[in-house]
């Protein structure tokens, strides 16, 4: 009897104290309601030097991430018919040795990529998100044995592209840093 009364009082306290309001569902409230189709045109490579398909990897990573986390948003490569456009550019690409072995050869390399992204609302004709200084780093190690050599630069670029896409799409879909119009 005492235990049942204690449980009832505890439950009543929890309900009255407002603990039921602690849960807030995650929604895509950061996006304007009219945005249903997002265009992701090919990113531009503005960095010095030539890197094979870096901009393509970033474009594809963003498209995959919008499909994965966009709550039903349609993705296309062309601007025509889109409600929003994600424009991106690779502003800098640096590949440097950061740790040397006993012979003075680089064993650990670091890839630094600086990207810019602008997300525009086509219907309202305004910028809803802009960050021209996304900086991503990843490191990888070369094998000492030349027979087991595998170029780790490509997987490192893929990891950076995925991290970039996750950041951009998260900011876009969740409304983090989305520019609000002052009233």
Model-derived segments and their meaning:
Residues 1-8:
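Bacterial N-terminal signal peptides that target proteins for export
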Residues 8-18:
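Bacterial N-terminal signal peptides
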Residues 18-60, 64-67, 123, 146, ...:
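A structural "domain/chain start" motif
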Residues 27-28, 71-79:
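Short aromatic-glycine motifs in intrinsically disordered, low-complexity regions
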Residues 49-60, 106, 110, 150-163:
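Soluble non-cytosolic domains of exported or imported proteins
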Residues 61-73, 93-96, 118, 122, ...:
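Structured segments of extracytoplasmic/periplasmic soluble domains
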Residues 73, 81-133, 137-151:
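Surface-exposed short loop/turn segments
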Residues 125-183:
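A charged, solvent-exposed segment within the mature domains of Sec-exported extracytoplasmic proteins
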